[in-house]
């Protein structure tokens, strides 16, 4: 580590690179006070990069990477913390702050504040006892259920929705299993006058399963299966099953920082329709194959992600679907960042479209999928922040913590 043999009068300057929904910045600033926090990454001595992954038990695995810059250039450390699903937000932030504090001590000992820092160790009461493997009566299975609803009503219109889901997961180093079911109900009503009213109802149901076998640090094999129904897609019943294989250019253990995954699968889809389709079908069974590639990377300069998906029916390759997407959040220079997301799909596989013409109400209320050959979307934003680089003070009065910035989106 640069200047490791000398102490500096300057405090360690730290840049926290962590989404606000993962890190409680005010809490960290009040709990870890032996460093200075800066708003600009290039002004920092230590860039703290936080990434996460979901664990098999429903918790969150944090990877905390401390990257030395300026006087600590070349220093690199990685810390891990697993937050249990049952943790409260306070328990998680306390543990996260404790681990981050330990990581920052490595740098702070090279400042004049070193004499004020102490590290303690709480010796377990039964330290002499041999370690016993933890017994898991659930055998790594995690179950969850979710139900929610909302309504919004006015004199001439009202909206209501109900959603429910069930999930069962089992994740080990060798296997990954997931079973999920969900149902959605959406209703919209519009009253034009005392005698005219439009009502739109959309229902959908899905049952999905996934089994994945770990082969190596770069290869996996899996099986997708599912059943669904959707009034929007004219599908009374839809079934699919397809085995697949996946390859990652980078070892899976690096997935919180970077991934380049390629997946290919071949399978069968079966459909039963509510109404006769544009191809005069009420039911059909078709073989298909699908290929997808996805890339993501998060570094101190920002994050990028993108991918492409393509699928077609083997009996009629002309019935196909291809899509690409790209997103980025880049810190271009001091105080200035750019973020955008875009996607495009070429669509030629809408075999489910009903033959009869849609009414004006169906179109306006989006009650049924309409024919299209493409789908495109874009969002972009710029952010510029300037002023004092130091960001140590927490002042919760009247809400918020102050600071001026300029934001523009298009």
Tell where the protein language model's regions lie, with residue ranges.
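Transmembrane beta-strand segments of Gram-negative outer membrane beta-barrel proteins
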Residues: 10-14, 133-153, 174-179, 260-268
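Short loop/turn motifs that connect adjacent beta-strands in outer-membrane beta-barrel proteins
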Residues: 133-140, 173-176, 214-218, 233, ...
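Residues that define the transmembrane beta-barrel architecture of outer-membrane proteins
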Residues: 139-141, 158-162, 201-205, 237-241, ...
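Transmembrane beta-strands of outer-membrane beta-barrel proteins
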Residues: 143-145, 177-179, 221-225, 241, ...
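Residues on the lipid-exposed face of transmembrane beta-strands in outer-membrane beta-barrel proteins
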Residues: 145-147, 164-170, 209-213, 227, ...
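Transmembrane beta-strands of outer-membrane beta-barrel pores
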Residues: 149-153, 172-174, 183-189, 225-231, ...
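Outer-membrane beta-barrel translocator domains and adjoining extracellular loop/strand segments
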Residues: 156-161, 190-196, 234-241, 272-280, ...
